[in-house]
Amino acid sequence: MFPLLLVAELVVLSLVTSVKSQETDPLHGSKDQPLFRGADRNDFAIVVSPGAIECFWQFADQMGYLYFSYEVQRILGMSHDRHIVATAHTPQGFLIDTSQDVRGQINFATQETGFYQLCLKNEQNRFSSIQVYLNFGVFYEGPEVDHKQSQRKQLNDTLDAIKDSTQRVENQVFHMWRFYNYARMRKVADFFLLQSNYTYVNWWSTAQSLAIVLSGALQLYFLKRLFTASTTDTKKPRC
């Protein structure tokens, strides 16, 4: 009975390990199913815990351009250090670039096809979480990389010209969208800073008002004590 239980536990552990490896490895997939590449453009906000590391994977083909922008929006905790470390790694795990600031960008050309790792490290704060807005993705200059493109028929010169013009317009609109998202990140960060300053000024004004009222009450109390004298039959106040 005991050997059967031991074998069953080993089977369960192997299944759990295989499931975990499938969840954590972005490159893992069956040979029969196509590889899930994900979206080419991503923008969202995330909260990084104290001393934690948050990583994301962006798929990119060779000869593309990958951009990674970040903006610290606010700090949730006692610390006031708004700096965060951003890193980018190749699909093989080699470091490409590092940025450590309140806001920054990492842009580079993709030299190989695969999942590029983008990480945020909140190593400067041990007691405060940081809310960061992210905007990252990949774009391609010139013809889009596609394995099926070689099998398509060649279009005539007029359609090629229309396609090139449309692609140039699309690239320009895409870059406008990138700059718009970066400006939106700055706007949200300024809003949280303004809200924090407003709360600080209100609390400081309230504390000063209470201090003024308390000091006035104490002064009135001590002045009243100076002019108040106890009178008895043998001890009377003198002029």
Curated annotation (Swiss-Prot):
Q: Where is the GOLD domain?
A: 53-138
The chain's Lumenal topological domains, given as residue ranges, are: 22-200
User: Span of the secretion signal?
Assistant: 1-21
Q: Which residues lie on this side of the membrane: Cytoplasmic?
A: 224-239
The record's section on InterPro entries has: Emp24-like, GOLD_dom
Q: Name one GO cellular component term.
A: endoplasmic reticulum membrane
Protein known as: Transmembrane emp24 domain-containing protein 6
Origin organism is Mus musculus
Its gene is Tmed6
